[in-house]
Amino acid sequence: MIEGLKVKALICVVEIIENGINSIHAMGILLFALNILKKASVLVSRILCAWNGKLSSEYPRDPRSRLGIFKNMNIAFICDGNRRYARKLGLEDSFIKDKGLQKIYEFIEFGCFYGIKEISFFCFALSNFKRSPEEVNKLMGLVKQKIERPKEIGIRPKFRVYGRLDLLEEDVRKRLMDIEEESKNNTSIIVNIFFAYSAEDEITRGIQFNSHVDILIRTSNTKRLSNFMIRQVAKGTSVFFAKALWPELTTAHLFLILLKHRLENKYLLG
């Protein structure tokens, strides 16, 4: 029954409330509407649990399905689980990390489609330098070879890079800085890349990232922040721990996570 439920049914619920909640005066009707929203939120939660790791990358692409429900949101990801996914499938880490990188572009496209204002990815922690030199070198090689320039993506994101770039090899640092420079006038969506980064280090060196974040999503069901977005969470950023590993997370997962957040925060808590 849960698997047969269409995402569009939930969108219809949101659309009804979006169009009518401001004009509802009868308290009984209002409570009824809020009860529907609460049940819809619970259904979204159940779908996320039932379909964890199994959702396709399909989501409503019809412009009429957008409704502006995610417009101007600021979302962030802790991209965790690449190595576990590689072990799970018996594949090379480098292949999986490439897949994980493509997942970033997939979510940037999703964000552009739904009018998300800002999207952040925690890709490489400062503490990751403690990993084996071989693993670190493979990741740096992936950055040099696979990160696409803004003009090659097909959309026009504005990239911002945060972290200790001074600790990176010169060619890796130049690659990241070039992407930031080339996209500085783009306006479709702001994409923040956190590389060689930790929140504690940022505070020590002076605050750089000050944007309010609506929701922080961490994959792999690891319930910790890993020194990321600490100030934002302390100031009210919602946190969602997804069971799916980073390469398993799909745009359908993301759609439902954001819809759940929207239902709860705009109508049930706000």
From Swiss-Prot:
Keywords: Endoplasmic reticulum, Membrane, Transferase. CDD domains: Cis_IPPS. One of its GO terms (molecular function) is ditrans,polycis-polyprenyl diphosphate synthase [(2E,6E)-farnesyl diphosphate specific] activity. InterPro entries: UPP_synth-like, UPP_synth-like_sf. GO terms for biological process: dolichol biosynthetic process; protein glycosylation. It is found in: Endoplasmic reticulum membrane. Pathway: Protein modification; protein glycosylation. It comes from the Eukaryota. GO terms for cellular component: endoplasmic reticulum membrane. Its main location: endoplasmic reticulum. Its EC number is 2.5.1.-. It is a peripheral membrane protein. Cis-prenyl transferase that adds multiple copies of isopentenyl pyrophosphate (IPP) to farnesyl pyrophosphate (FPP) to produce dehydrodolichyl diphosphate (Dedol-PP). Belongs to the UPP synthase family. This is Dehydrodolichyl diphosphate synthase. It comes from Encephalitozoon cuniculi (strain GB-M1) (Microsporidian parasite).
